[in-house]
Amino acid sequence: MHKITIKEFQNNIYKELLAVTSDANIETEAILEHITKLKKIQIYSNPETPISNEKIKIAKNIIDRRKNREPLPYIINSWDFYDLTFFLNSDVLIPRPETEILVDTALYWLNSRQNSIQLIADIGTGSGCIGIAIAMHHSSSKIIAVDVSKKALETACRNIHNYNLSKRIHLINGDLLNSIDSKLDLIIANLPYVPNKDLLDLQEEIIKFEPHQALFGGEKGTEIIENLILQSKKYLKKDGCFLIEINPPQANELYEKIVNT
């Protein structure tokens, strides 16, 4: 009896996912890694390895849930960001590739500094992916990771523990900078910036499954960010750095806010 191989099953998964996502190739690889417990290079190095019926059944269940628009990272409780793997669930946003630019910029700035220890606030930490990525690539940084959601902090705590960073990343359940009593070298944030009125413009899987508290920033979308900008003057050192992810159409208005703060 013919046993289906990794390569054959990979093609089958890819075809099924084409109707669901534009990232069918990435998601196919992620599903295979999840069910086989193999790294991507091992999957491509052993295309003729047979897949067990049990693993096929698990994959089909994943695909069925994906066809219901449930995001894959929530199904497999895992996703990669900045070449690191994070535990994820629907209490936190799924890390996006464009947010890696924020980490790149932070590391560039940190590496240009003369001082050894840098105190960083990661505001709206969610899964902890930004703070953890910085800590893993800048060994002398200390991070205060803040979120209003206790459930998000539970997820962040799990990821921090997975990377043995509990001594370097301190979690706070709080609102923006209100619970911090130190001057900061760097404030970095990926806060909600979607205007409330844009709810129905988002993809179905975002609306149905991702936490709205982490998406919507008020009537304009910038209210929470504006509050952080106002607070930053008190907490940021004179030679410090303020980095935030925003929606490009909001750039001019927020730039004016920063200049005039």
Task: Describe the predicted segments one by one.
Residues 17, 110, 160, 232, ...:
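Conserved hydrophobic residues forming the short capping helix/wall of the S-adenosyl-L-methionine
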Residues 219-261:
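Conserved Class I SAM-dependent methyltransferase catalytic core
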Residues 31, 69, 99, 130, ...:
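Residue-level signal for inorganic ion chemistry
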Residues 33-109:
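Conserved AdoMet
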Residues 100-201, 249:
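Conserved SAM/SAH cofactor-binding pocket of Class I
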Residues 193-224:
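Mobile active-site "lid"/loop adjacent to the S-adenosyl-L-methionine
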Residues 165, 210, 236-238:
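Helix-to-beta-strand junctions that scaffold the AdoMet/dcAdoMet cofactor pocket
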Residues 1-36, 40-44, 48-49:
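Non-catalytic accessory regions of SAM-dependent methyltransferases
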